[in-house]
UniProtKB/Swiss-Prot annotation:
Belongs to the Ycf4 family. InterPro entries: PSI_Ycf4_assembly. Keywords: Chloroplast, Membrane, Photosynthesis, Plastid, Thylakoid, Transmembrane, Transmembrane helix. The keyword Thylakoid applies. This is Photosystem I assembly protein Ycf4. Seems to be required for the assembly of the photosystem I complex. It is found in: Plastid, Chloroplast thylakoid membrane. The gene is ycf4. It comes from the Eukaryota. One of its GO terms (biological process) is photosynthesis.
Length: 184
């Protein structure tokens, strides 16, 4: 999603609150909870879940391994839910031609660097760079080359844009910023 006028362009970044992240966190939570309950029922010797008789799963080694997988899965699920709650990776890219400044803001993990804020002068932007890697794990990324700073990614690598959409976005941004486009 973006907002644009003659002198200002704001590009809003989604972050971790995507449908796929909600689905993965929910599936991982349910699966790991199931593993933990099966491991616990094998330890107690009675059915916590009525799907599996506790006599079929011996605590050592199957019950221990299932309990370990359940606990590990719950930790990973907790991590995913925290990134969704904190909305890690969301923010905006603001390009202001009137002031000649580019502002990039992202939310991070809680702590000293929770708010990630970068500011550049437009005159320091060398180019807009497109990096396209086709194949099994196709990757299309849009970068902004800053003099003395290197390349800053403007689009997340997990967003599935087609090559045409990336090229269109790069062309519009390069035209707005009045800088050349590089393709790698």
């Amino acid at each position: 999603m973006s907002w644009r006028s003659e002198s200002i362009w704001i590009e809003f970044i989604t972050g971790s609150r995507k449908t796929s992240n909600f689905c993965w966190a929910f599936i991982l939570f349910l699966g790991s909870l199931g593993f933990l309950l099966v491991g616990t029922s094998s330890y107690l010797g009675r059915n916590v879940i009525s799907l599996f008789p506790s006599q079929e799963i011996i605590f050592f080694p199957q019950g221990i391994v299932m309990s370990f997988y359940g606990i590990a899965g719950l930790f990973i699920s907790c991590y995913l839910w925290c990134t969704i709650l904190w909305n890690v990776g969301s923010g905006y890219d603001l390009f202001d031609r009137k002031e000649g400044i580019v502002r990039i803001f992202r939310w991070g993990f809680p702590g000293k660097s929770r708010r990630i804020f970068l500011r550049f002068f437009m005159k320091d932007i060398q180019s807009i760079r497109i990096e396209v890697k086709e194949g099994v794990s196709a990757r299309r990324v849009l970068y902004m080359e800053i003099r003395g700073q290197g390349a800053i990614p403007l689009i997340r690598t997990d967003e599935n844009f087609t090559t045409r959409e990336i090229e269109q976005k790069a062309a519009e941004l390069a035209y707005f910023l009045r800088v050349p486009i590089e393709v790698f």
